[in-house]
Structures are given as C-alpha cells and as structure tokens.
Amino acid sequence: MRSKYIVIEGLEGAGKTTARNVVVETLEQLGIRDMVFTREPGGTQLAEKLRSLVLDIKSVGDEIITDKAEVLMFYAARVQLVETVIKPALANGTWVIGDRHDLSTQAYQGGGRGIDQHMLATLRDAVLGDFRPDLTLYLDVTPEVGLKRARARGELDRIEQESFDFFNRTRARYLELAAQDKSIHTIDATQPLEAVMDAIRTTVTRWVKELDA
C-alpha cells in the first residue's frame, strides 16, 4: 500500500490533538507504523518563523497584518512544508499525519476573512498544483464549544481572539467545502469524547480497508 497523507481540521478547541492520537493508534492497529507528524503553519525552521509572525499578537508590534499578507504567509509556510517534508516522506513510503492544511486557509481566510474564494483557489493551485491530502477529518464544533475549550488551555493567539461571527463564517465555509469533497469526512466533535474517538476509528479503519479492496 502506498503511503498516504491524512489531515485533521477544525476550529480552535475541536480536539485535533486527541484526534491525531486516535488516528495514530488506529493506523498502528492496522499495521501502519512508519509515520511523521506535521502542523500548519510550521513544521520546518522557516515555516515555524512564519508561524510566529502570523499568529503571535506581538510579533509585528502595532502594525496591522493585512488579510492578503496573512494569506501569503500561510502559503509560504505551507509550500515550504510540503516540498521539504511532506512530499519527501510520502516518496519514502512514510505516512504523514497533519494538523491542518489548505482547507484551513479556504475556511478561515475564505470564510472568516471573506477573501475572494476564486482568488484563494487560484493561489492554492499555483502554489500546490494538484497536491491534496488523501483523507481529511474535519472535526465540527460550534464556536461556542470550541472557543470555550481553547480558552481553558490558556492564552489565545491572534486568530483565536477573533469574534464569534468570524468563527461562525469559518465553520460555515468548512461545512460547505466538506459537502463538496468526498475526501473530507465530517466528525461531530460536540459528542462525548468516547463517541468522537469511536467515529474517528471507524472512519479511518473503513477508509484504509477500502484502499486494500
């Protein structure tokens, strides 16, 4: 079986870290043990510096980061990660488990920020070509639930401090995109933890077994 790229998506507080652990456990039970883990933005020395710039409230002092500058920093970090980490890992037969990928930009910047969706799609295609995750698990929570969990973790980053309206628009775009793409599987992450974990196990197990069919 060829190596695959699995991405976990969702609003802040959706439970991506727990989901990643369940994905890893499930893959190991299916005999897949050669894995690497990525996060976006980040995952390389350059991408981590860009992460600090785009997410740290104090990184540029009082200067306002424009919406388009924000998008371009996300894509700069993303293409660096894809070309230097993800693609080489996949070529070597290693599975890649990612915390966020391009769907985040389409939802947060296209939905939350209201940036032209055609422009974002064009930019994605120019930067990434036809490279896409093989499977995306979208953990769906309301902003009220997700941000309550995020705030319980401690200090919020620049984007986590956006308004409920911003996150409602982001969630709506996530759901819209998930409905259009069969590779995106929506998990109701407002359920009790064990139910969410079971849903992830079932989804990943069924998907991997279909690869072997």
Swiss-Prot record:
PANTHER family: THYMIDYLATE KINASE, UMP-CMP KINASE 2, MITOCHONDRIAL
Family: Belongs to the thymidylate kinase family.
PROSITE patterns according to UniProt: THYMIDYLATE_KINASE (PS01331)
Keyword ATP-binding among UniProt keywords: yes
Binding site for ATP: 10-17
Xref: Pfam families: Thymidylate_kin
Organism: Escherichia coli O157:H7
InterPro entries to which the protein is assigned, alphabetical: P-loop_NTPase, Thymidylate_kin-like_dom, Thymidylate_kin_CS, Thymidylate_kinase
EC number of the protein: 2.7.4.9
Listed SUPFAM superfamilies: P-loop containing nucleoside triphosphate hydrolases
Domain of life: Bacteria
GO MF annotation list: ATP binding; dTMP kinase activity
Function, in words: Phosphorylation of dTMP to form dTDP in both de novo and salvage pathways of dTTP synthesis.
Entry's Gene Ontology BP terms: dTDP biosynthetic process; dTTP biosynthetic process; dUDP biosynthetic process
Record-given protein name: Thymidylate kinase
Catalytic reaction annotation: dTMP + ATP = dTDP + ADP
Cellular component terms (Gene Ontology): cytosol
